[in-house]
Amino acid sequence: MPDIGVLYIVSTPIGNLEDITLRALRILKDSSLIAAEDTRQTKKLLNHYKIHTPQMSYFEHNRFKRIPQIINHLNSGKDIAVVTDAGTPGISDPAYKLIRAVIEAGCRVEAIPGASASITALSASGLPSDRFIFEGFLTSKKGRKAKLERLRTIEATIIFFESPKRINKTLNDILEYFGDRPAVIARELTKIHEEMIRGKVSDLLSYFTEKTPRGEFVIMIGKDDPNVFF
């Protein structure tokens, strides 16, 4: 019976293709298969580094089909690398469901660290990083207001992801529930048009009311503390 393969959780660049580790490149090259959230997006990275490993799509809506296939592949002794479109798989990403299933099946999981939008944004924000909460994307459905009500009481920097279509609504809601706290928005991290906007929540709302929001956003809200300011 062959040894059980390893599922490698491989972090990939969030924009700049140079932001990938030597180890990640080796794993992507040596694995027998890459499970990618969007194979077209991952193909750009693979082509850039002349990696020819075959791909399989893995995303939220095909996971029930793909998870058994991936586990069978691992049980046959073959290693698989799982990647998301950008950043670290499993962080605000459906890969965590695959990872849980692989662990339950008795297979080995190994993380290959690298880029993460939330940590990249926080490190350059100027907000306290001794304690932070990563919330990911706020739901647009029932429970959004209750979630904000709970988060406002936490003494930590709060990190959200948001899309350009919803950025102004989310900033309005944050202003209503959190008050006019110090905040930072990181936009298009590591890309040509990277931007960090710092100020109060109301300042950021004014900025994106006057300027059409574009790109990918990380919102960071400082805790309610007079020592935290911009």
Stretch-by-stretch model annotation:
Residues 6-7, 77-81, 157:
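Loop/turn-to-beta-strand initiation segments
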Residues 59, 67-116:
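Glycine/small-residue-rich loop that forms an oxyanion/phosphate-binding "nest" at active or ligand-binding sites
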Residues 4, 157, 161-230:
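A contiguous loop/helix-start segment that scaffolds small-molecule binding in enzyme catalytic cores
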Residues 57-64, 137-141:
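Conserved helicase motor
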Residues 28-34, 106-109, 157-158:
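Short active-site oxyanion
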Residues 14-16, 85-89, 164-166, 224-226:
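Short glycine-rich anion-binding loops that position phosphate/pyrophosphate groups of nucleotides
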Residues 1-61:
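Glycine-rich, flexible N-terminal cofactor/catalytic loop recognition
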Residues 97-154:
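Class I SAM-dependent methyltransferase SAM-binding "motif I" and its flanking Rossmann-like core
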